[in-house]
């Protein structure tokens, strides 16, 4: 690889890293190509990219980005997963894949500029996804007016029962 090719790779990786909300460094030593392809497909479904790149180029590319804390940790055979939409979905996809593959491991990551250990990435995977959190928040916000309306409906219903009872008593008398 000549200098211009390396510079192009660095620039491309740097621009993708700047746009990513999460970056996770993984170990893939000895994994067959079929498994790596399955991983890439799974990650793509979750709005993520998976790059296998030379450690030196990755270190240079991550310098000056929000994910700089992991830039110094590129050692041996590793690749980086960059997530753009939902960091939790990316962490879940990687954690699930790590459970099924003995040759794949999560090393560390970075979430919006903060370094994460492998355990923290696994903990992140246990959180509900962004759509689930939004649904819970909307459900909670919707519960207050619903309960309010139900309360007033019960009061009005009770008043109507009392009036109906009075009407039937007057009609009987």
UniProtKB/Swiss-Prot annotation:
Tell me which UniProt keywords the record has, alphabetically: Ribonucleoprotein, Ribosomal protein, RNA-binding, rRNA-binding
Some GO term, biological process aspect, for this entry: which one?
translation
Looking up InterPro entries in the UniProt record yields: Ribosomal_uL10, Ribosomal_uL10-like_sf, Ribosomal_uL10_bac, Ribosomal_uL10_bac_type
What superkingdom heads the lineage?
A: Bacteria
The UniProt function text for this chain reads: Forms part of the ribosomal stalk, playing a central role in the interaction of the ribosome with GTP-bound translation factors.
Q: Which NCBIfam families match?
A: PRK00099.1-1
Question: Which named protein is this?
Answer: Large ribosomal subunit protein uL10
The organism is Nitratidesulfovibrio vulgaris (strain ATCC 29579 / DSM 644 / CCUG 34227 / NCIMB 8303 / VKM B-1760 / Hildenborough) (Desulfovibrio vulgaris)
| Gene from which this protein is expressed | rplJ
